[in-house]
Amino acid sequence: MSIDDVIYVICLLGCIGAGSYVKKIADEGQRKLVSTGLGVLVVVIVSGLHSLHCFVSLALGTAAVLLVHPSKGHLVTFAVMFGYLVFFRIFDFYFGIPGHTNMIQMILTLKVSGIAFEKTAAWKRLQAHDEQKKNDQRDVHQESPIEITDYDVELQSLSAAEILHYSFNYIGVLTGPYYRYRTYRDYFEMPFKTYAPTVEATLEKLKYAVFYCALYLATNYMWPLDYALSDEFFNDRSFVYRLLYVWPTFFTFRARIYTGLTLSECVCTMAGFGAYPDESDPNNGEGPRKRYQHLKRDADKHTYNFTTIVNTRVLEVERCWTFREGMKHWNVCVQYWLAVNVYKLFPSKKYRTGATLLCSAYWHGFRPGHYFCIMGAPFYVSLEDMWDKLVRKSATGTSRRVIDVIFWIFKWFAFSYLGEAFLLSSFGNIWRFYSSVYHIGYISWAAMTALGFYLTSQRKAAERRKKRAAEKAAGGDGIAAAIEKEKAQ
C-alpha cells in the first residue's frame, strides 16, 4: 500500500469518526460551516498546493451557474467543469498530481455541473407551469397539471456560499458518493438523521470494508499488477498463465474499489447523511422518488435506509449472471448522474449510448486504457444480448442453470480482460499485454458475434418457413372445406 493510500484511508477514518460529532451539532448553520471546514481540510491534506485546482474550477463553475441564464446554464457549466479537466490532466501529465486529488476533482466536476442541471430542470418546470396557468382553456382531462415545489423556486436563487458548502462538504469530498444538492439540503433541514440507525449501519459496512481490504492486501501481494509489466512475465510465463492473470489482477482492483467505496459510505452513514424513510422510495444518487416532506412530522415512527448513498451493490455485481446486469450495479450513483444529465438529454437517441460512455471515459481520464475498457463494454454487451436470446432466454431447469454459470464465467472474463486495459493504462503496456495473449478476447468475441449473426439468421429463416407452411396448410384446409361444401350442395 502506497503512502497516498495510507493518507487516504486515515482521512476516511477521520471523516467517519467526525460523523458522530457533526450529527449532534444542533445549529444547522454551524453544522454546515463545520462540514465545509472539514471538507476543505481534507482536500488540503490530501492535495497540498494542488488543491488550488479544486478552488479555481469551483470558482469558474459557480460563476457559470449563477451568471448564465438557466436556459443555457447547464450547458455552459458542463463545458466549464469538463473543460477544466483538460487543463487539470495536462498539468498532471507534466507535473504530476496525487491520484486522490484526481478523484476529488472528478467528484467536484459532477457536483457543480449537476447542480446546474438541477437548476435548469427546475426553471423549465417553472416556465411550463406558468405557461399552463396562462392557458385558461386547458383541458384538464387531456393534460395533467405540472407540479412545482419550493425546491424548484429556491434553486433559482442559489448563492455562491451554498454551492461552496455543497461542493466541499466533507461527506463525499474524497471519493463520493455523488449525491444531489437536494440530498445535501435535506441533511440540514430534515430530522431523518436523528432517527436513522447510523451506528448499526456504519458497523455493518465497516465489517465488509475490513473484509474487502484483507482480500485486496492478500491478492495484491500474490498477484501484483507490476508483475504484468515485467520482462519475466512475458518471457518466462506461458500463454495460459498470462491470459489467466487478468482474473486475479481485476479481482484485486475490485477489492480495492470496494474498500474505498464502502468506507466512503461509512462516512455518510455515521453522520446520518442520505437517510430517508422507506416510504419515500429512495434511489441511488437520486434520493426519494416519492413525496417525503410530510414524513418529518412523525419521523420517529419510520424505518430508514441509506440507499441514496450506496454507490456499488457489491453482492449483486459479484453474483449476477450477465455483464449487462453487472454494469447496472457498479458505481450506480455516477451512473445516475450520467443517465439523467447525458443519456436522457442527448439530442440523438441513436448515438446517446455512445455519447454517455464517451463522457464516462473522458471523466475517468485521458489515458488510452480508459477508452479501451469503457468503450469496449457496449460491444460485449451486444454480443451477450445476442447469445442470451439464442440460448439462455428459452432455457429452463438444469440447462438454464448450466447456461447461467457459463454466462457468469464469460462475464468475469470480459470484465477482467477489458479491465486489464484500464489498469495497464498506457497504449504501449496495453498493446504488449494483448499481443502476448494474441488478442484472444477481441478475436473470440468477433467470432462469437459472427456465429451469433449466422445462427440468428438461420433461426429467423426457419421461423419464416414454418410460418409459410402454416399459412399454406391453413389455405389448403380452406380449399378442401370449400370443395366439400360444393359437393354437399
Curated annotation (Swiss-Prot):
Coiled-coil spans in chain: none
Keyword Acyltransferase in annotation: yes
Residues at the catalytic site: N331, H364
Highest taxon listed in the record's lineage: Eukaryota
This enzyme's EC code(s): 2.3.1.-, 2.3.1.23, 2.3.1.n6, 2.3.1.n7
Chain segments annotated as transmembrane: 2-22, 40-60, 75-95, 405-425, 433-453
Residues making up the signal peptide according to the UniProt record: none
InterPro entries for the chain: LPLAT_7/PORCN-like (IPR049941), MBOAT_fam (IPR004299)
Keyword terms of this UniProt record: Acyltransferase, Membrane, Transferase, Transmembrane, Transmembrane helix
Main location: membrane
Gene Ontology biological-process annotations: lipid modification; phosphatidylinositol biosynthetic process
Top-level enzyme category: transferase
GO molecular function: lysophospholipid acyltransferase activity
Compartment list: Membrane
Catalytic function, reaction form: a 1-acyl-sn-glycero-3-phospho-(1D-myo-inositol) + (5Z,8Z,11Z,14Z)-eicosatetraenoyl-CoA = a 1-acyl-2-(5Z,8Z,11Z,14Z-eicosatetraenoyl)-sn-glycero-3-phospho-(1D-myo-inositol) + CoA; a 1-acyl-sn-glycero-3-phosphocholine + an acyl-CoA = a 1,2-diacyl-sn-glycero-3-phosphocholine + CoA; (9Z)-hexadecenoyl-CoA + 1-hexadecanoyl-sn-glycero-3-phosphocholine = 1-hexadecanoyl-2-(9Z-hexadecenoyl)-sn-glycero-3-phosphocholine + CoA; a 1-acyl-sn-glycero-3-phospho-L-serine + an acyl-CoA = a 1,2-diacyl-sn-glycero-3-phospho-L-serine + CoA
GO CC terms in record: membrane; mitochondria-associated endoplasmic reticulum membrane contact site
Pathway: Lipid metabolism; phospholipid metabolism
Protein topology in the membrane: Multi-pass membrane protein
Functional description taken from the UniProt entry: Acyltransferase that mediates the acylation of lysophospholipids to produce phospholipids (glycerophospholipids).
Family, per entry: Belongs to the membrane-bound acyltransferase family.
The protein's name in its UniProt record: Membrane-bound acylglycerophosphatidylinositol O-acyltransferase frj
